[in-house]
A protein has these predicted regions:
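Conserved ATP-binding subdomain of kinase catalytic cores across diverse folds
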Residues: 25-42, 71
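Post-signal peptide N-terminal segment of secreted/secretory-pathway proteins
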Residues: 76-78
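Helical "lid/coupling" subdomains associated with nucleotide-phosphate turnover
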Residues: 19, 43-72, 85-95, 103-125, ...
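Short glycine-aspartate micro-motif
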Residues: 5-9, 133-137, 199
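N-terminal basic/disordered segments at the start of proteins
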Residues: 3-30
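Ser/Thr-glycine-rich phosphate-binding loops at phosphate-binding pockets of nucleotides
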Residues: 12-14, 139-145, 204
Length: 349
């Protein structure tokens, strides 16, 4: 497998790239991350789902920049996956060919179930151990759910409700009265088996909600990954965000680039959380990009070996190599010599 691998998630709202560096058979770490808010799905949902020229050009420009970044970092592999906006578009093949011709980059357009599976794969392997849970990844064009039971991926579904889709079809057109009627049959597509106390939150909208809760509660850590909260305890705060005006969102710790879709994200989140009877929300800092990488790293398996921690393995690979191990007695003696007078230790020790 390549030493450095880039994974690009070509979403309806944003294009994100992560560069991973492999340290050993299963050891790896994130070198850097890039994000461009290109809105590939902009004005597509009220125009027959056809990708618009301005949006395609923004996406092409972002991919050209990402390609330069991969060359700078000397990546040997580049995976680019297209999700909802691309798979829904009648002109998706034209866009994929355009990127191939202009940038020599290959885009793999994945279906909704594959997108759901990749998010579930990342959560299963990279969150603190959990036995059962249902992942929810709210994107710009769709929302994916993955059922995990007894540390196994059981089932995956994709729903045609996303933040950009709802924004263009209902919020921007003032047709809010029709929203409940629109979403009700979509929620009915969620099987009863997906009901779970643990909802694993994936995606920018859900991370923004978790970040706001962390700030409100003066949570001591800045790391969102694996942050957990009880939905009943925080629902009031979430509704305050939902009911606030745009100018007030910054007071809740919501970033400006999230202002125009956070309410749609909250609406989808609360409806699905209620449908699956979720009680605890587990925030995932990983998603489809990590899932794509793990699929390549772990194959033909889907999980790490028993009792294996990829983070610890990475630290071991980076800082405890054989040459450094040989210096341990040397450093130990230096520490002893420096502190022996303070602790009144005899040289014989």
């Amino acid at each position: 497998m390549a030493k450095k691998t880039a994974v690009v998630d070509l979403g309806s709202n944003s294009i994100r790239m992560v560069i991973f560096e492999k340290t050993s058979r299963y050891g790896f770490y994130t070198t850097c991350e890039y994000k461009r808010k290109v809105r590939l799905g902009e004005n597509a949902y009220n125009n027959g789902k056809i990708l618009q020229e301005e949006a395609m050009q923004r996406a092409e420009d972002a991919l050209a920049f990402f390609k330069q970044c991969t060359l700078k970092h000397k990546c040997k592999k580049i995976f680019i996956v297209g999700t909802s906006a691309l798979r829904d578009a009648p002109n998706s093949k034209n866009f994929i060919k355009r990127i191939k011709d202009n940038l020599s980059l290959n885009i793999r357009c994945i279906d909704g179930k594959s997108e759901s599976y990749l998010g579930g794969l990342a959560a299963l392997n990279l969150l603190s151990p959990f036995k059962d849970g249902t992942t929810l990844d709210i994107g710009g064009g769709s929302s994916e759910l993955c059922l995990i039971k007894n540390n196994r991926i059981i089932s995956c579904i994709s729903l045609d409700i996303g933040t950009v889709r709802l924004k263009e079809l209902f919020y921007d057109t003032g047709k809010m009265d029709s929203l409940e009627e629109f979403i009700k049959p979509i929620l009915e597509q969620i099987p009863k088996e997906f009901c779970n106390q643990n909802l694993i939150a994936i995606g920018g909208s859900l991370r923004a909600i978790s970040n706001s809760i962390m700030q409100k509660n003066s949570y001591p850590l800045k790391n969102l990954h694996d942050f957990r909260y009880m939905l009943d305890e925080e629902k009031g705060h979430i509704l305050k965000i939902f009911n606030s005006n745009l100018d007030s969102l910054i007071n809740f710790g919501i970033k400006k680039d999230r202002f125009d879709t956070i309410k749609e994200g909250i609406f989808i989140f609360l409806k699905i959380a209620e449908k699956i009877k979720a009680k605890q929300v587990i925030t995932s800092g990983v998603g489809i990009r990590e899932g794509v990488y793990l699929q390549d790293l772990l194959r033909p398996k889907i999980t790490f070996p028993p009792n294996f921690n990829p983070s610890l393995k990475c630290l071991q690979d980076k800082f405890l190599q054989s040459k450094q191990k040989n210096k341990t007695p040397h450093f130990a003696l230096q520490i002893f010599t420096t502190l022996k007078n303070l602790h009144k230790l005899n040289d014989n020790y």
